[in-house]
């Protein structure tokens, strides 16, 4: 019913809850459940729904991939990367799609208004893809969202070895300082 009514949130919530329940009751049933979602992902022509399926599959493979491909670690890594890339393949479409279509799966957080309640912010956050998120908001002129995306990017991508650098020479501190300098006029930067 949810699929025919395009109630994507209801549909996705049901799929996720179903996979979690199957996994908690009988861990051997995880693979068939994932294969069903993969089949639905392959069949859909709805770009927004395809992105949501890809994000869900990315999360499953990221958390349970070693069980899904126990005989082939590279297969698990390849699937994880494939679904992560597919989840955010159409950044512009995701930026224009409002998450209301996907309720109750997507519950608006405290920053939802900064991102305009769009699907891009949800999927980029779920898959940890902050650079495309930053680029989209920067290009579209949403400086508050670009600032948050840039801060998340620095937080997750600028790596350093603990204790290797003095604070004054830390790549993380330099990157963070640069972001704050660019967006110092915004409340979300401070």
Could you tell me what each predicted segment is?
Residues 1-190:
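Extracytoplasmic/secretory-pathway proteins
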